[in-house]
Curated annotation (Swiss-Prot):
Its cofactor is Zn(2+). Belongs to the AP endonuclease 2 family. Zn(2+) 1 binds at H70, H108, E145. It catalyses: Endonucleolytic cleavage to 5'-phosphooligonucleotide end-products. It holds the Pfam family AP_endonuc_2. Endonuclease IV plays a role in DNA repair. It cleaves phosphodiester bonds at apurinic or apyrimidinic (AP) sites, generating a 3'-hydroxyl group and a 5'-terminal sugar phosphate. This is Probable endonuclease 4. Binds 3 Zn(2+) ions. SUPFAM superfamilies: Xylose isomerase-like (SSF51658). PROSITE patterns: AP_NUCLEASE_F2_1, AP_NUCLEASE_F2_3, AP_NUCLEASE_F2_4. One of its GO terms (molecular function) is deoxyribonuclease IV (phage-T4-induced) activity. It comes from Mycoplasmopsis pulmonis (strain UAB CTIP).
Amino acid sequence: MIKLGSHVSFKSPNYLYDSIKESIKNGANCAMIFLGAPQNTKRVDFEKYQYEKYLKDFSNLIKPEDIVVHAPYIINPASLEKADFAISFLSSEIKRMDKAKFKYLVLHPGFYGKNNVKDSLDQLARSIQKIFEITKDSNVEIMLETMSGKGSEVGKSYEEILYVIDKVKSPRLGACLDTCHVWDAGYNINDYQVFKDELIKTGILKHIKVIHLNDSKNELGSHKDRHANIDKGLIGLKNLKRIVHDPIFENIPIILETPWTEKGPIYDQEIAMLLEK
């Protein structure tokens, strides 16, 4: 089954209910939300989610486990100086997700800053191990997102993501493949068979449980991270459609994070375009 949706807003007054209502209107069967603004860690009480109303009206169309949660961008679990805050916040975020039976938490791996890459990857692994200890009774899984290599980002290669997965050794840790990010990091999606073979050869394919499907405004290997609308960037519609329809990605939530136009988001048009055979 193809699972295709988008990032949708999560805001007052109806929070989750309106998020999923919008997703269904767009023709989606999965969705991604932030449980607050992407740039901060403020959170509302679970009672405001309108969760029971969502279950009653929409859970037959988009199940709780097909609602992906994205962690705030400002969290840096790879930082030797800021890891304690990341551990505390992400542990609390997982407990919030447990209440709603959400399954996947997408996490940017973080930045190495003034430290070196290996020390930061080791810190990231320690942070995740600690989070899993604190939330040992949880079913929530953390998905480390593949990054573009902008600035001092860690997670810019499959090997860096796999290094952390291998150190943590938990079935609760996997990967989120972002097409714009891997393109900007130097993985050529336009040579689709080579791209796919590398996913298999490196061993990361079996860990991918969420996909962010975005076109890119920049050249291959640019390390920029600038998303483009579907078929408006340098990856192009053909190869993004190949990902959507490839059986190896069956039943994986595929989430659009493409830019808004002057008239607002066009996720409905992009979803329809991608589902067309």
